Amino acid sequence: MGVRAPAMMYEPGMGYSVGVSGLYCEFMKNILEAIENGADSAAFAALTIAATYRAAVVLKSEQEMFAGVASADKDPRKSVHVQEVATPEIAPDEVLIAVMASSINFNTVWTSIFEPISTFGALARLARESSWAKRHDLDYHVIGSDASGVVLRVGSAVRNWKPGDKITVHCNMYSMAAVFQWVW
């Protein structure tokens, strides 16, 4: 199983090639250079954030596409799409990271085959909890729960992380506003 999208290729000292717009390329180039040069937190905080990013998504309009199909016959390649999505405003207890590597785990597969339930129902319920949570009730859902990358922005309630921190993200859910802010 896999989804392939035009990739930005980068190797230190080798320059950049793109499969996306020049503006996006410049955005990623600046992040990669900051990492490579050991930039401090202030330099990461000063980076301009792109208005959109490329993401693997499932679509609300397709959540019934596997109705009546046995689980073993549901093919995630049919439901996962790669598209540009708006970069969200971060909530006080959230961080914005530039993902440098990600993986597929059981949550990704379940989301892509809409089992055991469609995540769109859970996101709609979450949206009723607060104005910040409402931002997640969209016509698409960005999938993925395991990643590594670098922190670009932190919400006002985040205390243990700062722009420039290199992090690993896992699928357990912890609040960034909690006493123990967990990112592995």
Feature names for model-found ranges:
Residues 57-59, 113, 151:
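Residue-level signal for short segments within beta-strands and strand-turn junctions
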Residues 86-103, 117-177:
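Glycine-rich beta-strand-centered segment in the early N-terminal region that forms part
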Residues 34-46, 63-101, 106, 140-142, ...:
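A short N-terminal beta-strand-loop micro-motif at the entrance of redox/enzyme domains
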Residues 179-184:
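Short, compositionally biased
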Residues 1-27, 31:
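C-terminal glycine/acidic-rich active-site capping loop/insertion
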Residues 107-111:
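Cytochrome P450 core scaffold surrounding the K-helix E-X-X-R motif
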Residues 56-57, 168:
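Residues in well-ordered beta-strands of folded domains
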Residues 49-56:
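Short structural boundary motif marking the start of a folded domain
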